[in-house]
Amino acid sequence: MGKNVVVLGTQWGDEGKGKIVDLLTEKVSQVARFQGGHNAGHTLVIEGKKTVLHLIPSGILHDGVTCMIGNGVVLSPEALIKEIEELEANGVEVRSKLKLSPACPLILPYHVALDLARESKRGDAKIGTTGRGIGPAYEDKVSRRGLRLGDLLNEQRFAAKLAEVLEYHNFALTQYYGAEPVDYQEVLNKALELGAQLRPMIADVVDMLHTSRENGEHILFEGAQGSLLDIDHGTYPFVTSSNTTAGGTATGSGFGPLYLDYVLGITKAYTTRVGSGPFPTELECDVGKHLGEKGHEFGATTGRQRRTGWFDAVAVRHAVRINSMTGMCLTKLDVLDGLSEVKICVGYKDSNGAVIGIPCDAEGWADVQPVYESMPGWTASTVGAKTMEELPVEAVNYIRRLEELVGIPADIISTGPDRVETIVLRHPFEG
């Protein structure tokens, strides 16, 4: 009997999902992306070699694994072809193993132009998007005017739809944002050229997933970003434009929720965030600087320096609930090595001292003050540990306390960037 496992981030992204997906892929026949676009970066380190993926599932580095991009992913043909060519230049076979849903909404140059124009107009109130057209592409999908990958299979139909939607967006670009219009013919020619390369990879992803399930094969669903960036459950409006939570797995792939066996929450041992938005436990001091430098906290997609802070158990417990998580994988434990004291946010209070729960808007988040619990740190190194017995007792106590606070066990603990630097207490595909 096969198992179907979802891997998600429990924080604001950058939790280390890429390494864990790569580790788990050894057991599966298929890996599927179900939301987001090329705004997310998945960094893998295998035998010392670093690979950064943005659209293609991390399982592409494994032989015999089919990688799928489901209908919930907004797809930039240009970004995808570039990523394919980069992998091929490094000797990785991609095209025969990658399958694309024809229902994927397309990201085209006018989406990028809109994204950049909006952020520029917002000024200091900007959301902090990656400027890659993700939000505008999802807007087109919801408004039912968006072009989809399957439209490229009929060039005349694609050209007609493009003319209509580009007229709409060029009006906004020129008349509201004061930006330059996007050239129709350039967009059309480039899209058709790239579409010809993508056409052989277009497949019925829904049917392929269910055929694998019926054949008793293991399937892994790879989430992007993190639960606190979810369009509905995140720190709105400082969120992404898709459902990054477990519910998005079903809608973004066509794989029913009752078929999912295990939801693994990837959880950093401290907290980071890229760009604007609420961050109750942020540290603007030497400890925060230490976490950023030791953790190499720079975005895989944008290169922007990440903000750093203590572990927020309130936020992670919220993520556990909305995802019905089975267990967590604790990553970057080694970054806390050398600290004499570690703190955990165990509650929120407002400016009047009243205990509060998870706010529902930016104004509510602005009033949040963290309530901390302190624990002894550890000086011994945790780097490369493969068993709990190799960890300092203080590190073990820290892990156990996090388990108590968020309500799920730490089934996997990552002690370094390489896949072998991992403690596996309960394997999602074996337990």
Swiss-Prot record:
Gene Ontology, cellular component aspect: cytoplasm
Q: What class of enzyme is it?
A: ligase
Binding of substrate occurs at: 300-306
Q: Which cofactor does it need?
A: Mg(2+)
Q: Does the keyword Translocase apply?
A: no
Q: Name one Pfam family in it.
A: Adenylsucc_synt
Q: What is its EC number?
A: 6.3.4.4
Reactions the enzyme catalyzes: IMP + L-aspartate + GTP = N(6)-(1,2-dicarboxyethyl)-AMP + GDP + phosphate + 2 H(+)
What Gene Ontology terms describe what this protein does at the molecular function level? adenylosuccinate synthase activity; GTP binding; magnesium ion binding
Q: In which pathway does it act?
A: Purine metabolism; AMP biosynthesis via de novo pathway; AMP from IMP: step 1/2
Paste the cofactor note: Binds 1 Mg(2+) ion per subunit.
Output the GO biological process annotations, alphabetical, semicolon-separated: 'de novo' AMP biosynthetic process; IMP metabolic process
Binding site residues for IMP: 14-17, 39-42, 130, 144, 225, 240, 304
Keywords from UniProt, A to Z, are: Cytoplasm, GTP-binding, Ligase, Magnesium, Metal-binding, Nucleotide-binding, Purine biosynthesis
What is the annotated role of this protein in its UniProt record? Plays an important role in the de novo pathway of purine nucleotide biosynthesis. Catalyzes the first committed step in the biosynthesis of AMP from IMP.
State the oligomer form and interacting partners.
Answer: Homodimer.
Give the record's family classification: Belongs to the adenylosuccinate synthetase family.
Q: What is this protein called?
A: Adenylosuccinate synthetase
